Amino acid sequence: IGPYYDDGDVDALTPADRLGRFLIENFVPHGYGVAQVSVFGTGESNHCMDLMGLDEQRGIHAAVEYLGSAPFSNGGVGIIGKSYDGSTPWEAAAMGSEYLKTIIPMSGLIGAHDLMWRNGSMEARGAIMHNGVYGSFGLDGDLEDAENACEGYLEGYYAGPAAYLSGD
């Protein structure tokens, strides 16, 4: 579960290259299913991207509940990922679900606060990487972009430096 699945074709017969091919080649032969799920505001999802926020957690929880209760499912869901995708398993575990049986988070964050803020001010890498890079994943030049643009993103670029300069 992450922001990297931008193939945009729900009927695709091949996986996104990120972890999908590895998972399909190594897990499917042993009876596991693989689903690649985009967080809000990325891929073909809509909504404002809520970087590791409550809305993102609710979306991840909804995906776990759906996959665990689907007719094709045996009721067991596991989540694996690295980098951003390595953070989403923790979000799923924090929400709690009878269907979530295991998580394999690799090189992810337990929370974004320490990455985004230092000494009461937003770090430049926080605004650039997360608001800029991840925030742009939901923007692809179509009419739905307005739904994916978060009103607080622009604030993130000036709030940290302004607080630092003003002492607030």
Language-model features: locations:
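Beta-sheet entry/capping signal
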Residues: 33-34, 75-78, 99-103
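Alpha/beta-hydrolase fold nucleophile elbow
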Residues: 71-84
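Short glycine-/acidic-enriched loop or helix-start segments at secondary-structure transitions
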Residues: 10, 46, 89, 114-115
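Accessory cap/linker subdomain of secreted extracellular hydrolases
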Residues: 17-23, 29, 91-168
